[in-house]
Amino acid sequence: MNYQGQLSASWELDFWGKYRNNYTMLSDVLLNTVVSHEALRLSVASQTAQSYFALLALDMQLATAKRTLRTREDAFGIYTSRYRQGDITELDWQRARAEVETARAQVHSSTVAVDSAEASLAVLLGRSPRDIMSAVMPRGGDISKLPAPPVLPAGLPSELLERRPDVRAAEYMIMAYNANIGVARAEFFPSISLTGMLGTLSASVVNLFSGPAGAWSYGVTGSMPLLDFGRTWYNVKDAEAQKEAAIAVYRKTVQNAFKDVRTSLTSQREADAIVAASQAQVDSLRRAAEIARLQYDNGYTDYLTVLDAER
């Protein structure tokens, strides 16, 4: 009976770049995951900011609706007095009443919109279900006091779009699938390994680790499948198809990036025009209300005209 103890090791030589390409592929996949996480974080931050400012805008709409309701209720009170005195017809009185109910419905509609915006913002902020159901979101500063957004300088290079996380993520996937082609092609070639063994051999357990009991060996081995029925070839074609699909996704991502830029620039330009027109409208209505108030103070018109102007 012989007793032996041995330690063996094997090292596969990466002649064909199989493991190098596999490492590159995994690294690019990891970078894609990191950049995709960054894109998701930016998306959530953007949605949160948009939801917050939308909530502030809805607050202003609700406040305006409440002021309109009070004004129309005051006007309706005057219409009611004049109707009882026979100064106006029932048709005018019913129209005034309808305006009150229209304003009241607008208040309720704006209240629902504000509540929905609060719940959406609470979800984006990761609040608990109890907070989502009951808490009122803090508003912070007045939206009308916010500084104007900075003006984008003209002539910005389109290369800036390469910094977008979604574009970078798509690019990393192309690189990963390209490296995967190298992994698949390496299967066409044999695997070459260095092997070695170091141990002891003895007929006695006592002499197993002493005396002339040492034994060692080394060598080079190679292996590859003789018949794979085209599996490796199809794997290469599949890897190439995945790369082409990744290129198509990258092109689509770049197209969407340019579309977003165009939409944003157009929206900003038209928003500036809308703000200017709205400000001119507000100035005209404010001046009309001042004139109506001045005429009423001097006895040239009745208070109903003032309420209509303030409405």
Question: Which residue ranges define each predicted feature?
Answer:
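Outer-membrane beta-barrel proteins
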Residues: 90, 203-207, 303
